[in-house]
Design a protein with these regions (language model features):
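Conserved beta-strand positions that form and line the central face of beta-propeller blades
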Residues: 61-62, 82-85
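The canonical Cys-X-X-Cys-His
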Residues: 36, 40-50, 98, 102
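Gly/Gly-Pro-rich "capping" loops immediately C-terminal to redox-active cysteine motifs
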Residues: 27, 31-37, 49-77
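C-terminal capping alpha-helices of c-type cytochrome domains
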Residues: 76, 88-107
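N-terminal export/targeting leaders of redox proteins
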Residues: 1-30, 107
């Protein structure tokens, strides 16, 4: 009897998930611009600031940066001077999505 109730409950909970979000695992969810902005807040703003001008611990002022997209990607990936590498903590796709966020901080 308990097994029947469990089975019915399991089937009903599976059927109630009709959207793709219920089926698709979170790691397969596309990385969005909003996610990139949040990633900047979490990984970058503590040194660069929300406006790119903080300069904590020698962080460069991103509002005056002239780096190309490739240079920004390389800096995020490998780090530079006191900035650590993020190669092990975020994906290349996420790094590429950070480029427009970083460039949006320019004057």
């Amino acid at each position: 009897m308990v097994l029947k109730i469990f089975t019915v409950g399991l089937v009903l909970s599976c059927l109630s998930c009709s959207s793709d979000a219920c089926i698709e695992p979170l790691e397969n969810k596309p990385f969005t611009e909003s996610d990139a902005a949040n990633l900047y807040t979490v990984k970058c703003s503590s040194c660069h600031g929300s406006d790119g001008k903080l300069g904590l611990s020698g962080a460069k002022d991103l509002s005056i940066s002239k780096l190309s997209d490739d240079q920004i990607l390389q800096t995020i990936k490998m780090g530079k001077n006191v900035m650590p590498s993020f190669e092990e903590s975020i994906s290349v796709e996420q790094m590429k999505m950070l480029i427009p966020v970083v460039k949006s901080l320019r004057k």
